[in-house]
Design a protein with these regions (language model features):
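Catalytic domains of cell-wall/extracellular-matrix polysaccharide-remodeling enzymes
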Residues: 143, 190-302, 307-310
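Hydrophobic alpha-helical packing residues
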Residues: 26, 148-149, 174, 236, ...
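Active-site beta->alpha N-cap acidic-glycine motif
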Residues: 90-183, 187-190, 209
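Positions that flank functional sites
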Residues: 39, 43-45, 163, 189, ...
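Secretory targeting and sorting signals
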Residues: 1-39
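N-terminal low-complexity, Pro/Thr-rich disordered segments
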Residues: 32-119
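Ligand-binding grooves and catalytic loops that recognize ribose/phosphate and carbohydrate rings
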Residues: 61-68, 74, 79-101, 167-209, ...
Length: 310
């Protein structure tokens, strides 16, 4: 409280009154414990100090969080060991509050493509992250679902109905585990060799199938073999496609293949692989994941979820 000095001619006659008022105020403040609070705000809210209930609650909460993080870390170490990973996968950073602006990669343009879905192989980011995508759906390995769930590795699926239709349940299980199911056409045909209407049946027909069996029309589309033309992108846009992610690298159980001359990963690169097994590969899908994660982790990258950025 600041005491304002009175003018001299009123000072004498009011001094006694002022003193009396001050005495009452000071006594009231002492009795009430200064209800306004030591920080000067109404209500007396302030940071708890040691020995008071608020401080104990904060300490307990911090300890509980530390225990939770320790359990999570132990579970990740155990999962990496269980699935034969030499190193524990690195954790991806939190997704951006605003998704980056995606544009078509230079050299991948089509005439009049300014308003068409962008075609790209890398997501613009400075984070050391990459994205794992799997195409077609031919191999339906239950071990893959368990492995990816326990390792907490995000991935995206691009499905073709002609190899998915014999077991929609497998992909419903995958979707329930947080995987986004995207469009890879009905029959995996070479799109530039088809008429516009034939392409429409392939692309929009797959949109209809995915909505019917999985409850959602995708916004991401990958053309078979990575081949497309202007009609492909115009048709895709007409049935709800917003972006066309291709790939910067392809993963196999025994090696990696690279698009770029330096044969390396870069921030935001998209990795392609397929739903395949030992009939087609020298190894299983689990072997392929081990290869991917060794490459990614050794190079200091984490796997992030594509749909958080696109």
């Amino acid at each position: 409280m600041q005491l304002v000095r009175q003018k001299e001619k009123f000072a004498t006659k009011r001094r006694g009154t002022v003193c009396a008022v001050l005495a009452v105020l000071m006594a009231g403040a002492a009795a009430s414990g200064c209800a306004a609070g030591e920080d000067g705000r109404a209500g007396g809210s302030r940071e708890p100090v040691a020995g008071r209930p608020g401080a104990a609650a904060q300490k307990d909460a911090a300890a509980a969080e530390a225990r939770r993080l320790k359990r999570e870390q132990a579970a990740r170490v155990a999962a990496a060991r269980k699935w034969g990973l030499a190193k524990m996968p690195l954790a991806a950073p939190a997704p951006p509050a605003v998704k980056p602006r995606i544009t078509t990669r230079e050299g991948f343009e089509v005439e009049g493509g300014e308003t068409l879905p962008p075609v790209f192989t890398t997501v613009p980011t400075k984070e050391r992250i990459v994205f794992l995508t799997m195409d077609d759906g031919a191999e339906k390995d239950p071990e893959l679902l368990r492995m990816m769930t326990e390792l907490k590795i995000p991935y995206s699926a691009f499905l073709s109905d002609y190899v998915v239709s014999d077991d929609y349940g497998y992909f419903k299980d995958m979707q329930a585990r947080g995987v986004t199911l995207n469009n890879h056409t009905l029959n995996h045909r070479y799109l530039p060799g088809l008429s516009k209407e034939e392409q429409r049946r392939e692309i929009c027909g797959e949109q209809d199938k995915l909505e019917k069996y999985f409850g959602k029309r995708p916004t991401l589309f990958r053309p078979p073999y990575g081949n497309y033309n202007g009609d492909t992108l115009r048709v895709a846009r007409s049935c709800g496609i917003k972006a066309v992610p291709l790939w910067a690298a392809e993963a196999f159980p025994d090696h990696m293949e690279w698009r770029e001359w330096d044969q390396d990963l870069h921030p935001g690169d998209i990795i392609l692989t397929h739903f395949r097994g030992e009939e087609d590969w020298e190894g299983s899908m689990a072997d392929m994941i081990r290869r991917v994660m060794k490459t990614v982790t050794d190079k200091g990258y984490a796997v992030a979820r594509l749909e958080d950025y696109v």
